[in-house]
Amino acid sequence: MPIGVPKVPFRSPGEEDASWVDIYNRLYRERLLFLGQEVNSEISNQLIGLMVYLSIEDDKKDLYLFINSPGGWVIPGIAIYDTMQFVQPDVQTVCMGLAASMGSFVLAGGKITKRLAFPHARVMIHQPASSFYEAQTGEFILEAEELLKLRETITRVYVQRTGKPLWLVSEDMERDVFMSAAEAQAYGIVDLVAVE
């Protein structure tokens, strides 16, 4: 029997009694955000809204984005990345479990020197894929052109964020490249690996 989202007590400053809020709202109040699912428009908009709101509330205090994601849609992932670069506070990224595809792109988008992976985390990079393989020829060509532009954008961001040469990142994105936390650190996707 599902119990829903757990609730925890929270007392606002100046209030005598605590109120019960769902655990995610409590964590958001501490500036802790979660990408724990496939990247899509809904989770992207939710994270963007939270980052913007929290940066307006306090533009000096860091945000923490915990990532355990198999990847997902490219455009919503790029929107999360762009928002991370736009907001005033630093966004620290933490990989726990898996950051694959768009998940690794968002992970790399954290403030350089503030990107962390748990010791047993896995990171995977690859090129963006299309689901329009049943489209008419004309549509398919347009889709392929757009996909090439997106691939170039993603590759250039990885080059900028990791310090790796363009040829290496481009070659690695040709296939699924899985990395341990230490390998992701050596590659430049994360800066630190948490100690066990």
UniProtKB/Swiss-Prot annotation:
SUPFAM superfamilies: ClpP/crotonase (SSF52096). It catalyses: Hydrolysis of proteins to small peptides in the presence of ATP and magnesium. alpha-casein is the usual test substrate. In the absence of ATP, only oligopeptides shorter than five residues are hydrolyzed (such as succinyl-Leu-Tyr-|-NHMec, and Leu-Tyr-Leu-|-Tyr-Trp, in which cleavage of the -Tyr-|-Leu- and -Tyr-|-Trp bonds also occurs). GO terms for molecular function: ATP-dependent peptidase activity; ATPase binding; serine-type endopeptidase activity. Gene3D superfamilies: 2-enoyl-CoA Hydratase, Chain A, domain 1. Transmembrane segments: none annotated. Keywords: Chloroplast, Hydrolase, Plastid, Protease, Serine protease. Cleaves peptides in various proteins in a process that requires ATP hydrolysis. Has a chymotrypsin-like activity. Plays a major role in the degradation of misfolded proteins. Component of the chloroplastic Clp protease core complex. PANTHER family: ATP-DEPENDENT CLP PROTEASE PROTEOLYTIC SUBUNIT (PTHR10381), CHLOROPLASTIC ATP-DEPENDENT CLP PROTEASE PROTEOLYTIC SUBUNIT 1 (PTHR10381:SF15). Belongs to the peptidase S14 family. This is ATP-dependent Clp protease proteolytic subunit.
